[in-house]
């Protein structure tokens, strides 16, 4: 969604304007080699997704990082729609935090969008010494021109949910966003809504607990989170904590509605496969309620007798009509109508693989949702892109074949009128065929921004 406004900053004035933007032609994806047998650095892949191009569905450029075992994960921009009113700002640098090494790479995508180049490396010691933080995750551009990055830990691997500020021009570490001593026990994602003077952050777990895989005992030991943290956007103080309980364990991606006047949003909670709605109450504080629950399946031939869906990423359409999320273990993508914010209604579902396959080693003994799957009705609509890798340590644990074969990128055709999802069988990017060996491609970014990178003021 690249801006076409003369004299404007990056992005679009409103989310609805962004929906009218031109079709995407390329995407960027981090590709990971950590936890594979391939001793090569992670890299940024540029993929051609223009159906009219001779390179359609091909990786057209690879930018290797200068170090091994970084664990690239998510990415963000130096400037986005939050800077729309500032014509001096350009969306020309992609920010790549490294989840394990704690490096932050700044990539130049402005000089040649189809052949990105490394612009700067922020070393871990800058985060350690200047901020007392490590394991950076989510990067968001701010209206001030600065870049804010959430963290998951301290330099010793303990949980610590703080925020690093980078200068938007030099990319030097400025310091902490949060007030001294006010970091949350755990960190992961965040989203801000300045009109309500609020930011919400989430919790994954302590880096030393999740660094090499998932152990349920670590949940019982308190090494994973289950809370949302509410921050005063102006004073940078943590003003409220919402404990979601066991059903809200491991709250990952948090999404406010795109309408900057809205005072509500949703968060996907991985362990119990729930979605909570959070909202501002008439009293002016914040509350949360469970609005979606994906039942576990009773199985045999798997690690546990009950298999959760394991909700990972969630996103909201730019018109705030639909919520999408993935069940990483069950293997399906879901679409919910959220026009009734308190009562989301599933209107689309497509299965792409996962741990439950016909003639596979896992046998389903009981599935409470067996008769509730909607039939795809793709009349006209848009596109949803998905990848199969989540995080290399969990990939290795739950999908060992993914380590050997690499991940894939798929396209889902979306009915944005009445709902419906269908796999596009003419689209596939196979990262198992990469020159250095099978790679684990994770989160996508469009050069012009998208519904998880841009925040409107």
From Swiss-Prot:
Gene Ontology biological process terms in this record: protein transport
Record bears the keyword Plastid: no
Enzyme nomenclature, EC number: 1.8.3.4
GO molecular function per UniProt: methanethiol oxidase activity; selenium binding
Entry keyword Zinc: no
Organism annotation: Danio rerio
Chemical reaction(s) catalysed: methanethiol + O2 + H2O = hydrogen sulfide + formaldehyde + H2O2 + H(+)
GO cellular component assignments: cytosol; membrane; nucleus
Name of this chain's protein: Methanethiol oxidase
Superkingdom assignment: Eukaryota
Transmembrane feature ranges: none
Family: Belongs to the selenium-binding protein family.
Pathway listed: Organosulfur degradation
InterPro entries xref list: Se-bd (IPR008826)
Function, as annotated: Catalyzes the oxidation of methanethiol, an organosulfur compound known to be produced in substantial amounts by gut bacteria. Selenium-binding protein which may be involved in the sensing of reactive xenobiotics in the cytoplasm. May be involved in intra-Golgi protein transport.
Membrane topology of the entry: Peripheral membrane protein
Disulfide bridges in this chain: none
This protein's UniProt keywords: Cytoplasm, Membrane, Nucleus, Oxidoreductase, Protein transport, Selenium, Transport
Subcellular location: Nucleus; Cytoplasm, Cytosol; Membrane
Top EC group: oxidoreductase
